Amino acid sequence: MSLLKRIAPQLIALALLVALVTVFYPGFLKLDLSGGRLVGPMIDVLKRGAPVALLAVGMTLVIATRGIDLSVGTTMAICGAVAAWAVAGGWGLVPALLLALAAGALAGLWNGLLVAVVGIQPFVATLILMTMGRGIAQLITEGRILTFNHAGFAFLGSGTLLGLPVPAWLWLACGLGMAALMRRTALGLLVEAIGINRRASALAGVNATVLLIAVYVVSGLCAALAGIVVTADIRGADANNAGLWLELDAILAVVIGGNSLLGGRFSIIASLLGALIIQTIDTGILLAGFPSEYNLVIKAGLVLVILVLQSPRIAGEWRLWRDSHRASREARAAQRSRT
């Protein structure tokens, strides 16, 4: 299946959603150039959608192995706290970033060992870190919002590069780079093999344990990068709210992308489109002026419609109707030609 055909439902859903938002807020597609940077609601979608898009990259790989990572939100909080603590302590930008990424990799390694070596169910294994992770972040920040004043670090969250927000470049580079790595090498097939049948893949010579651990480490690194972006944007680490419930949006982005929670075949590009759909819904509801208490209800309703339209059964019924309609039309044309 070609990439364009694979992501066609997500592209159509995104286009329809943008059209719907434009009805309520006509200036949604408007772009202006101010101070060398593009500004507008769509640019805001690209920037604000960065955390969920980054989380969705790692979550796609985890779900492809028939797993789940509920700890990505708290990993964001931990890594953001580590980065802010290091920068505020005078470590410098590069050491602070490396320390935050190392914390994310360590969190992923912890999850991977529990799942692949100890044999704990992914839901339970990652729930452990989800439960205690925010407490770890609060210990690092000493229960307060840890602020810093470092222009280089803040650039990662609120800076502009070639007219676009830096966070947008980060999730595009991460997502497209990982997608290319998975499809241009055998890694993608190996990940899918584990998700389809881990035991069979091991018997075929795949080191399923090491690869499974690596997938969770990648998820931790993606969460660390998301935590860095959020922390840099607000110039501070908020252990209580950073990444709060974003693991659910990340899972939803993967599902909207048409990836099965039962593992197997996956598409990172489709998951990125799923993240854009979620952020477009959030931004559209805000700009349309709906009362805040209706936001979650409207969001849930729109997501439900998108998922129903993308469901295999609906797609099958549509293809059946299309084929029967085409056959009927051809039969009528043939009958007219004979007469």
Role assignments for model-derived ranges:
Residues M1-L54, G90-P95, Q335-T339:
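Membrane-interfacial amphipathic/re-entrant helices at transmembrane-helix boundaries
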Residues V21-T22, P26, L38-G89, L113-I120, ...:
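Single transmembrane alpha-helix segments in multi-pass membrane proteins
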Residues G27-D44, A137-I140, T160, M182-R183, ...:
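Inter-helical junctions in multi-pass inner-membrane proteins, predominant
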Residues D32, V118, P122-R184, L211-A214, ...:
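Transmembrane helix-bundle core of multi-pass membrane transporters
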Residues M1-K5, I63-I68, A88, A105-F148, ...:
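Short loop segments and helix-boundary regions at transmembrane helix junctions
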Residues M1-V23, G177, I196, L203-V210, ...:
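Cytosolic-side transmembrane-helix boundaries in multi-pass membrane proteins
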Residues G92-A100, L106-N111, V115, G163-D238:
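Helix-loop-helix "hairpin" substructures at the membrane interface of multi-pass membrane proteins
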Residues A223, I234, D238-A300:
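Transmembrane alpha-helical segments in multi-pass inner-membrane proteins
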